[in-house]
Amino acid sequence: MEGDIVQMGAYIGAGLACTGMGGAAVGVGHVVGNFISGALRNPSAAASQTATMFIGIAFAEALGIFSFLVALLLMFAV
Amino acid sequence: MAEEAGTGLVFHPMEPFKIHSLFGGEVHWYTPTNATLWMFIGILAISLLFIVGTRGRAIVPSRVQSVAELAYGFVHKMVEDVAGKDGLKYFPYIFTLFLFIVFANFLGLIPMAFTPTSHIAVTGLMAMAVFISVTVLGFMKNGAGFLGLFWVSSAPLALRPLLAVIEVISYFVRPVSHSIRLAGNMMAGHAVMEVFAAFAPLILFSAIGIAVTPLSVLAIVAMYALEMLVAFVQAYVFTILTCVYLKDALHPGH
Amino acid sequence: MANETHAVDAAAAVAGHAAEAAEKGGMPQLDFSTFPNQIFWLTVTLVVIYWLLTRIALPRIASVLADRQGTISGDLAAAEEYKLKAKDAEAAYAKALSDARAQAQKIIAETRSEIQKELDAATAKADAEIAERLAQSEESIAEIRAGALEAVQSVAAETAAEIVVALGGKADKAALSTAVDARVKG
């Protein structure tokens, strides 16, 4: 019985952790959206900043991956 | 279990990441495993592309040779742009990492394949190697001046100690995020495809399968396309972050 | 659905995947017993890739790229040279053309003056001939005219004498000729 409650908590926690991915999605969208709006204003500078955009995406996405990892840990490792 | 037997739905999203010995038996540190197999297939593919493909040394390249040259030029330019001219000395190391990651990622997309880069042990080792060598290099090149990386001289004096603490923490989190980003991305994509794949045979067991099975097959196709993109982008991101860290070590003065 | 199934699995903890996974700590990534194995083989792999790249692939690609760069810049230099040559040739051609044109102009002028000279000579000769002929003609015309006048006078005098005789007069030769002379000249 005790184990069941722990399991339940872990699964609920896993589900909650998944909401973090939404934040990552917002972040990545924000980065790319701003990049595109900037690129449309000044297309000649866009090519040189693509690498910066990918770094930004990577940083924003990493946090979503962390929440996914927490969910996985709760589901399989706790 | 009874329900599982009834519907036939089996979820093993972690199944493709399991490591097992190729020839049976315990997994010791020297045992050839499926990870070994796929790493060696990666080596084989790299040699096919870069050694067999370029054996013509043609001035006007064949298709394979031009792919190899394209990859070379891509990473070479990245290192030069991000880390500067003096970073080119470390180009072979960075190119090795890039090739290993990109081939592991793409070969892992083959059905039934194993993806070495989805394991924290693999990405963690690479990230730690980058972290340690970059830190050592920074101290060797700049001496104590490397610590200037943490002392943000453009900020107001009162804020600098606080910023220094934050910078130090973010510096030491680098290998963690560096490794987990790659492993997590690889793992997430494969696990999601695995979950969709588990839904696919539903049509054999239940009426709602008529609606669910085509949807899940479509979802797998879409995820696969996304994973193709992710496989490349993550290799690119790992490499470019390595270049950024290298630049910090070579030119710590921001 | 995934959670549910897995919950059932895990809770039941029967033999099979879930129990095995639970034994191993769930995620294969966190199964630390496989870490030495992966680290060892990863090191081997990376060293092999590094060795292959630095020994064979990278020098080869770098040399091919350098060769290509050399070929391209060599070709460009050759093209530049050819361009200069073409420019020289063009200049020479233009010079030859203008020379030829000047020569032609000269020849034309010479020819024209020669022709003009000939023409002038011919014209002068023709003029002289014409003048001579004209003089001759005028002379002969004057002769003819004089002859004719004479004839007219003599005919007129004879006719007048005949007419006078016919009218029953006596022909005075001297008076008649004076009268005819006066009439004809008149």
Swiss-Prot record, chain A:
Location(s) in or outside the cell: Cellular chromatophore membrane
Recorded topology in the membrane: Multi-pass membrane protein
Positions of transmembrane segments: 12-32, 54-74
GO MF annotations, alphabetized: lipid binding; proton-transporting ATP synthase activity, rotational mechanism
Primary subcellular site in the record, as a coarse category: membrane
Similarity field: Belongs to the ATPase C chain family.
Protein role: F(1)F(0) ATP synthase produces ATP from ADP in the presence of a proton or sodium gradient. F-type ATPases consist of two structural domains, F(1) containing the extramembraneous catalytic core and F(0) containing the membrane proton channel, linked together by a central stalk and a peripheral stalk. During catalysis, ATP synthesis in the catalytic domain of F(1) is coupled via a rotary mechanism of the central stalk subunits to proton translocation.
Subunit text: F-type ATPases have 2 components, F(1) - the catalytic core - and F(0) - the membrane proton channel. F(1) has five subunits: alpha(3), beta(3), gamma(1), delta(1), epsilon(1). F(0) has four main subunits: a(1), b(1), b'(1) and c(10-14). The alpha and beta chains form an alternating ring which encloses part of the gamma chain. F(1) is attached to F(0) by a central stalk formed by the gamma and epsilon chains, while a peripheral stalk is formed by the delta, b and b' chains.
Record-given protein name: ATP synthase subunit c
Provenance organism: Rhodobacter capsulatus
Lineage, top ranks: Bacteria, Pseudomonadati, Pseudomonadota, Alphaproteobacteria, Rhodobacterales
